[in-house]
Regions:
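Conserved, mostly hydrophobic/aromatic
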Residues: 10, 41, 49, 83, ...
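Conserved anion-binding
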Residues: 12-25, 81, 88-163
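Short, acidic/polar
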Residues: 30-41, 75-81, 135-146, 198
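Glycine-rich, proline-tolerant flexible connector loops at the mouths of alpha/beta enzymes
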Residues: 48-59, 95, 157-167
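Conserved beta-strand positions in the central sheet of alpha/beta enzyme cores
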Residues: 50-53, 69, 92-93, 117, ...
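Catalytic cores of alpha/beta
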Residues: 56, 63-90, 172-208
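Charged helix-capping and loop-helix junction motifs
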Residues: 56-58, 133-142, 167-175
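Glycine-rich phosphate-binding active-site loops on the catalytic face of alpha/beta enzymes
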Residues: 81-103, 159-162, 190-197, 204-224
Length: 232
């Protein structure tokens, strides 16, 4: 399998949680130290970690070799630099791409497309921003197209309706989006439930996928992922 598998780590009060469709009232909390969880990811051979907590990010960056991509509330260059200083290798920018596209374009020029990821979160085919509370008329392709010539290299595209629902990803949609932008890595997020989902995405030509709830609930195990590492 060639697709890169990126575990997700969302935290509330220092504990790993998974939300259903981003709803904090429908969250499941998983015990254990997040650092121990990250160390298990690393031991399994995973290379990247997707997370949204700066304090825990610093601990994990200092104690593992995982490449951390951080997303959540990056609205200024100062905030972006804080994320990098905390140890993140990549930063995910969503709302700022819609509200201040010139700002993201400038960051892409300064930091490079290998460090800046566009966050494209979709509800009913339209981009949602501000923690998914505000919908826009933009589609994913339109938003990606705005930054294709600005050095954009990676997009995390989250299907909000499927996030945390274990219902399977919208594979055909992602495959079409990847085909439209062959020079941009489209990272799938939302709905992953089984190894079969990962296999289908891999066969469809997707390059990376974020796995959250299925991993924490044991539907996909670290042993499974260890056998699915790229080119193994």
């Amino acid at each position: 399998m060639n697709i890169e598998i990126i575990p997700a780590m969302d935290l509330i009060d220092g504990a790993c949680v998974r939300l259903a469709q981003g709803d904090y009232d429908r969250r499941t909390t998983y015990g254990g130290d997040p650092l121990d969880t990250a160390l298990r990811f690393e031991a399994a051979g995973l290379l990247r970690l997707h997370m949204v907590d700066l304090e825990v990010l610093e601990r994990i960056a200092a104690r593992t070799r995982l490449e951390i991509q951080y997303g959540g509330g990056i609205k200024s260059r100062t905030a972006l630099c804080d994320v990098f200083s905390a140890g993140a290798r990549r930063a995910v920018c969503g709302s700022v791409a819609v509200r201040e596209p010139d700002c993201l374009a400038a960051w892409l020029a300064e930091f490079g497309g290998e460090r800046l990821i566009l966050g494209a979160d979709l509800r009913d085919g339209r981009i949602a921003i501000a923690g998914w509370s505000e919908e826009t008329p933009l589609g994913a392709a339109e938003l990606i197209g705005r930054f294709r010539k600005q050095g954009l290299q990676q997009v995390i595209c989250t299907d909000i309706a499927r996030d945390g629902m274990l219902c399977g990803p919208a594979t055909s949609f992602y495959a079409a989006l990847q085909a439209e932008f062959p020079n941009v890595e489209i990272t799938v997020s939302g709905g992953i439930a089984t190894l079969g989902d990962l296999t289908a995405l891999d066969r469809a030509g997707l390059r990376s996928v974020i796995v959250g709830k299925a991993l924490y609930e044991g539907r996909i195990t670290l042993e499974d992922l260890g056998r699915c590492l790229p080119n193994e």
